[in-house]
């Protein structure tokens, strides 16, 4: 029998911690193998205030999953939520390499490179860089600029930022349990992926996720996240 390869996600909330494990199916989708939820203390409005209490809850949930599946969890993706997660917009531009032949993928990549060089404030880190739209010669807004004729290609990106201290505390809590954090994802963007259709994202929709300590809000329009916020309760 072929050994399964598992993907683990850990969501540490203000009232409980959820550990979910999935495996890849033949059709490429992810099948859920186990989900365990345990009450948690030591977390307030998404921020770890007591690492021992939070760690004990994570340990209990992880141990139950390991017992159920007969595996040892050593790495996982994590979700994070709190008022320390926010979005900010940034606009930049490049001059196209060959205006006579239209925008090519290299021009778009050059614009992405400029956005990747944008630095967060010292106390924050950038989690996501999401293009909102493109402008050709500052006149016409387009969704895919490749093939458009212009000298100047501009774009506005939505940056999702997270405070470094809450992120470091989450990483520390997992490392104390021997779990390496492969990546971290804002919960405000994770929930819409589970509940929204592509048509809903296209037409415009807001998702409000009311949790035990915070409420996550995400607004989608024309297929991309336009705004995210986390409100402490």
Where are the regions that the model predicts?
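Nucleotide/phosphate-binding catalytic cleft detector across ATP-hydrolyzing
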Residues: 1-16, 20-207, 224-228
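Short, glycine/acidic-enriched loop or turn micro-motifs at the edges of active sites
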Residues: 14, 211-214
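A structural feature that tracks compact, well-ordered secondary-structure segments
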Residues: 216-218
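A cytosolic small-molecule/anion-sensing beta-strand core signal
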Residues: 221
């Amino acid at each position: 029998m072929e050994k399964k390869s598992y993907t683990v996600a850990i969501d540490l909330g203000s009232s409980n911690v959820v550990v979910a494990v999935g495996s890849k199916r033949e059709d490429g989708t992810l099948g859920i193998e186990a989900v365990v939820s345990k009450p948690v203390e030591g977390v307030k409005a998404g921020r770890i205030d007591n690492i021992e209490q939070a760690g004990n809850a994570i340990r209990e949930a992880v141990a139950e999953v390991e017992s159920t599946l007969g595996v040892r969890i050593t790495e996982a993706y994590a979700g994070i939520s709190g008022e320390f997660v926010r979005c900010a917009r940034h606009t930049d531009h490049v001059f196209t390499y060959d205006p006579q032949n239209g925008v090519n993928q290299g021009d778009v990549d050059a614009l992405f490179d400029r956005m990747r060089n944008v630095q967060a404030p010292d106390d924050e880190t950038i989690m996501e860089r999401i293009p909102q739209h493109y402008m050709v010669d500052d006149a016409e807004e387009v969704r895919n600029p490749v093939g458009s004729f212009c000298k100047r290609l501009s774009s506005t990106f939505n940056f999702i930022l997270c405070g470094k201290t809450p992120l470091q505390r989450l990483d520390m809590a997992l490392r104390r349990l021997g779990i390496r954090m492969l990546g971290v994802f804002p919960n405000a963007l994770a929930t819409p992926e589970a509940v929204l259709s592509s048509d809903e994202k296209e037409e415009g929709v807001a998702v409000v996720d009311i949790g035990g300590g915070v409420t996550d809000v995400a607004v989608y329009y024309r297929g991309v996240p336009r705004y995210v916020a986390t409100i402490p309760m």
